[in-house]
Amino acid sequence: MRIGLVCPYSLTIPGGVQAQVLGLARALRDKGHPTRVLAPCDGPPPDAWVTPLGNSIPTAANGSVAPLAPDLSAQLRLIRAARDEDFDVINVHEPLGPGVCITTCVVKPAPLVGTFHAAGVSGAYKSLGPLVRWLAGRLDLRCAVSDDAELLASTKQLRHQVAARHAFWQRSAQQLRRDHQR
C-alpha cells in the first residue's frame, strides 16, 4: 500500500507532530509499505523519502508560533507530489491546519485519514463552522493522539453525520480495508 503522510509543520524545526510523523513513516517503511512524507522543510529534508514543500513561515496558532507553509507554491508542490505519487491512502496530520493540510482535504487525491493532535476548539473553528464541517467531511477516517484531541475530532463543529464516533471510525476503517483489498 502506497502511503502518504502530510505534516503541516516544517520537518527541520523540532516538534512533537513532526517527530510523530517521521516515526510513523519509518515504522510503515519497516513494515514494507512505500511511504513518503510531504511537508515544509527549511533546509535539506531529514530523509530521502521526504518531499519538501518549501520553507515555512512562522505563523501564530493556538497561542504559539507554528512553522507552516501557507504560500501558493507549497500548495502547488503538494498537489503535484500527491498526483505523481498516486498514493493509496494519505494520512493528514492536523487536517484542519492552514496550508498544506487544508489543501490536501480540498483536493482529496486519495482516501484521507485525519490525525488530530491539537486540543480544544479554536475560535476559528467556531467562526468558520460550515467550512470546517465541509473539510472534516472530506476525511474518510479520523483518529486522535490524545483524549483532548479526540474531543476536538468528535466535536459538533467537525461531525458531518450523527453517529457515535467509535462506530463511525470503525465503519470507516472497515471500508478502507475493503477498498484496499479490491
What are these language model-derived features?
Residues P8, H93-E94, F116-G120, R165-A167:
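Histidine-centered beta-alpha loop that forms part of the nucleotide-sugar donor binding/catalytic region
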Residues C7-P14, V21-L72, R80-A81:
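N-terminal strand-loop element at the rim of the active site
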Residues Q170, Q174-R182:
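Conserved catalytic-core segment of nucleotide-activated headgroup transferases in glycan assembly
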Residues G43, L96-G97, T104, D148-L151:
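Alpha-helix capping/helix-boundary segments
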